[in-house]
Design a protein with these regions (language model features):
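Extended interfacial segments that mediate partner engagement and assembly in macromolecular machines
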Residues: 1-47
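Long C-terminal interaction/binding lobes of large macromolecular proteins
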Residues: 54-116
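Short functional hotspots where side chains directly engage DNA or cofactors
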Residues: 51
């Protein structure tokens, strides 16, 4: 069973992408006040905790940006996209992926998104 999501976890995940509380909330479809409360120690619902945990995965955030990136300011979106793409360009071992590995992952994501 995964540990409870702490206020520090929420803030760490948000800051990992250089997002404001408002930007993080918009990309995940949460209320800004909810993100503030979670970062101040209130426990999120199970559904929101799972959503925030999923946001720790750069590939998940890439999908959020593609779907709802227009909800961010142009500067915030550009900054976050650069961070996400930089995080995605490394594999699980921290090694730089070659273009073929990145292409394969992109194709897999497109297939998964198409099935949703």
């Amino acid at each position: 069973m995964p540990h409870d999501l702490t206020a520090q976890d929420v803030k760490r995940i948000r800051e990992k992408y250089g997002l404001t509380q408002q930007g993080f909330a918009r990309l995940l479809g949460l209320g800004e006040a909810s993100v503030v409360r979670y970062e101040n120690g209130q426990k999120p619902s199970k559904a929101n905790a799972n959503l925030i945990r999923a946001a720790d995965d750069p590939a998940f955030m890439k999908g959020c940006l593609e779907r709802d990136g227009e909800l961010l300011s142009a500067g915030q979106r550009e900054k976050t996209e650069k961070i996400v793409y930089a995080l995605i360009s490394f594999d699980e071992d921290g090694d730089v992926m070659d273009i073929n590995e990145m292409y394969e992952i992109t194709l897999q994501q497109e297939v998964l998104i198409g099935q949703i």
